[in-house]
Amino acid sequence: MGGFTGQSEVSVSQGIRMMFYVLYPNETSFKNVEDVPDYVEKATVYFFIMLILEMIISWAWKGQPLRINDGLTSLSAGVFSRLPDVAFRGVEVASYIYIWNNYRLIELPWDSPWTWWLTFLGVDFGYYWFHRMAHEVNIMWAGHQTHHSSEDYNLTTALRQSFIQKYFSWMFYWPMAFCIPPSVFAVHIQFNLLYQFWIHTELINNLGPLEWILNTPSHHRVHHGRNPYCIDSNYAGTLIIWDRMFGTFVPEKEKVLYGLTHPINTFEPFQVQIQHCVLIWNTFWATPGFSNKLSVIFKGPGWGPGKPRLGLPEEIPQITGEEKPYDPKSAGYLQCYGMMHFLLLLAVYVHMFEAKLILTPATLLLRIGYILLTLTSLGFIFDKRPKAALLETIRCLLFLFLQKYDYMTTDVPYLRIINEVTFSICTAAWGLKAVKEAIERTKKLE
């Protein structure tokens, strides 16, 4: 989430239970917001354990291996979304603290179970309305559509997040800041997010009576569907009761087809993040009339002049059964290459967050730039773009430069030498490929 520095240990038992919101007030109550652990960061190991388990079970049970290109794109979006947290405390908590410090009306006790449970309900209620508006207000959808852009539905999809979305969500939690201490809010805003990880799976079917109260994989599959019956439904975070109360609940019926109604057809991370912002910009200037221009921003993504606020249901593309996910086939060695370099990138990413307080601004900026370049280059490779080889050559050269001048460091013995050898080989291989492709393009022009 960014900005949490609490050093409280999270046991293995607590780590597992926090993924399902099964923790007790007496073990997750803190007097000061600075004492609240960064539960999301501590959950990283559990994310990957659950991801690996899902991959194994899905492959062994259903014969459905993970699509590496789509899965890595989702993980890339998760990395992308957290980069602003290197420099800034999470805007949700920072804005909450400001209101609490300046405008609170009463101060509920931070160590009361009643405060804990009230905050649980308040955060989940705020999330429901934020999530609903993120689908019903076009400018907010620009931040949320990233999460819906995957055409697969698995645990990697849960990590496909937008770096823009957090700048809209904070206002929906403001009312609690008039009475609920920031430390209690900071706990629940993290647990609410963590709970939503495990429901992104096709491996769990109906959960019986729990389906009436909790948001479950079945309910959330509907939310991610692009079938007409799935659109604008099941906004719950933890409790599905809000959808039942406000008329947005839809049960799972026919097989769900996942993704956007108009697929983006790319694995390039910047397009995954901002393609709808570009669409809004172009539509804004192409739409006549000032009031219509405002409607482009503040009405639904499906709105157009003369249409209802949320657009016309009949314009939602029907499912024919012939739909195929965007999937340019990559050779097995390229998929292994992508996974290997993403794991190497994660080491850079994790170290940057751990050492952000002692790294110089120049080092932080260079590492952020390298991370974004790596994510982009992997996207180019999986998209099979013409300049992929050239971009990957530049990326590998940049890594060697950064390591040589100590902008990339490691505490692991011999890893520096291994990196130097690996990236030198990659530079040569991709460089040769880039030269060969350039020669072939030149011949075609002659």
Curated annotation (Swiss-Prot):
UniProt motif (Histidine box-3) ranges: 220-224
Enzyme class: oxidoreductase
Keywords per UniProt: Endoplasmic reticulum, Iron, Lipid metabolism, Membrane, Oxidoreductase, Transmembrane, Transmembrane helix
Localisation per UniProt entry: Endoplasmic reticulum membrane
GO MF, one annotated term: iron ion binding
SS bond partners: none
Record's GO cellular component terms: endoplasmic reticulum; endoplasmic reticulum membrane
GO biological process, one term: lipid biosynthetic process
The protein's Enzyme Commission number: 1.14.16.5
Intervals of motif Histidine box-1: 131-135
Main location class: endoplasmic reticulum
Motif segment (Histidine box-2): 144-148
UniProt topology in membrane: Multi-pass membrane protein
Catalytic activity of the protein: 1-O-(1,2-saturated-alkyl)-sn-glycerol + (6R)-L-erythro-5,6,7,8-tetrahydrobiopterin + O2 = a 1-(1-hydroxyalkyl)-sn-glycerol + (6R)-L-erythro-6,7-dihydrobiopterin + H2O
Regions that span the bilayer: 43-63, 110-130, 167-187, 339-359, 362-382, 412-434
Cofactor(s) listed: Fe cation
Record-annotated Fatty acid hydroxylase domain positions: 118-248
Role description: Glyceryl-ether monooxygenase that cleaves the O-alkyl bond of ether lipids. Ether lipids are essential components of brain membranes.
Family to which the UniProt record says this protein belongs: Belongs to the sterol desaturase family. TMEM195 subfamily.
Protein name, UniProt field: Alkylglycerol monooxygenase
Lineage per the UniProt record: Eukaryota, Metazoa, Chordata, Craniata, Vertebrata
